[in-house]
UniProtKB/Swiss-Prot annotation:
It comes from Shewanella woodyi (strain ATCC 51908 / MS32). Disulfide bonds: none annotated. GO terms for biological process: cytoplasmic translational termination. This is Ribosome-recycling factor. Belongs to the RRF family. Pfam families: RRF (PF01765).
Length: 185
């Protein structure tokens, strides 16, 4: 039972790290990256559809994304969805392709984005700590039910703490890489 609790805690912590990584990928840096447009939804036959389902998003050069829309009648809707997003992008259509140039980030905007990234990292750390708390309370519940000894409880808590430290270190590394990427001019 203790091994199941530890395995579950580790799996949930891995998911927290992945979620943090995904959230940070949405933050725009100076470079073009297809995941930048993942959060954009386009109205398609009455329902909001993710952009990647109505077209291919590719990198044209370091500061430009190219979107090849499958249905050419969708081009105006895709452009409008990109413009109305909070990314501050201005798409231009060229035939069946939509080009999205990424403007250079100002120093002030970089600092704002670093604050956003740090907040996302802190949310990830909090999620990992919540998993630790849940795992430790599950272990203590087992002790109360006399299914494990006090030594087992302390050993399990130590292992869960090691998982927690490792996952928080991973989040800190992701944060450091993203901050370095944001500060590149």
């Amino acid at each position: 039972m203790l091994n199941e609790i530890k395995k579950d805690a580790q799996d949930r912590m891995d998911k927290c790290v992945e979620a943090t990584k995904t959230q940070m990928a949405k933050v725009r840096t100076g470079r073009a990256h297809p995941s930048l447009l993942d959060s954009i939804k386009v109205p398609y036959y009455g329902s909001l559809t993710p952009l990647k389902q109505v077209g291919n998003v590719s990198i044209e050069d370091s500061r430009t994304l190219a979107i090849s829309v499958f249905d050419s009648t969708m081009i105006p809707a895709v452009e409008k969805a990109i413009m109305s997003s909070d990314l501050g992008l201005n798409p231009m259509s060229a035939g069946a392709t939509i080009r999205v140039p990424l403007p250079a980030l100002t120093e002030e905007r970089r600092k704002d984005l670093i604050k956003v990234v740090r907040a996302e990292a802190e949310n990830g750390r909090i999620a990992v700590r919540n998993v630790r708390r849940d795992a430790n309370s599950d272990v203590k519940a087992l002790e109360k039910e006399k299914e494990c000894t006090e030594d087992d409880v302390h050993r399990s808590e130590d292992e869960v703490q090691k998982f927690t430290d490792a996952h928080i270190k991973l989040i800190d590394e992701i944060l450091a890489a993203k901050e370095a990427e944001l500060m590149e001019v």
